[in-house]
Amino acid sequence: MATLLGKLFGEAPKTSETPQAFTIKIDPAKFAIATKPQGTIYVQLEALKQKLTKLSSNVENNLMLSIRASTKGNVELASSAFNFDEAYIRKGKFEVEYLTVAYSAFQNLGEEDLKAIKYARMILKDLERLAQLALNIADKAEYVKFANVQDLHKDEYGLKPMGDITAEMIKKAVEAYVSGNSKHASETLVMMNEIQSLYDTAVAKIKSSVNDQNIINLTGILSIIEHVKASADISCSIASNFC
C-alpha cells in the first residue's frame, strides 16, 4: 500500500530541513494557563482582550504593509510582510487560541464570561482570515504595476485609501468588543459605504480599460482590490455582533 501511495502522490522528500509550519518558536507553558482564573475572571478577560487588540493591530499593520508593497511593486517589502506574519501574527494567534480554548473548556466559567470568550474566539478566526488575505496581497507585489508608484497616498484605483479605511474598520470592530462601546461598531458599518464607493469606481475603471495587452496586470490589481474589499466585509461581520 505504501508503495502504491508513493507512486500516486510521490515519495516524501528526504530532508532534515524544518518544515515552514514549525519555524515559529513558542512555549505554551509561558501562557500561564490554569484550571482557575489567575486573579479575578475580570482581570483574566481584560488581559485576553489586550492580547486580542495587539493581534488585531498587527494584522491591520500587515494589511497596510502588503498593500503598500503591491502598489509600489516592491518585492522586498512584500517579503517583510511574510516575516512580520511569522514573527508576530502567528505567535499571537497561537497564544490567543490556547487561552480561549482553555478558559472555555476547563475553567467552569459563568454564562456571560463564556459568551465573552466565545466572541474572542470568533474574532480570532476572523483575524486569521484577514492575516491570510494580507499575505495573498503581498504575493502579488511582483506581478502588478501601478502608474504612480512614488505617491505614498494615492494610486489610480483608490487602493491605498481603501486599505487605510479598511485597517481603521478592523481596529474599530475589535475595539467595539474590547470596550463594549457599540459606537465603534456602528462607525465600522458606516465606513463600509466609502469602501463600497471606492470599490465600485475601481472595478468600473478596470473593466472599461482592459484589453489583451493589460489583462494580466489588471487581473492582479483587481484581485488585490477584491481582497481589500473582502477584508472590509470581515470587519463589518465582526462589528455587526456589537451594534
What does each model-found stretch correspond to?
Residues 2-243:
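Cytosolic, long alpha-helical scaffolding segments
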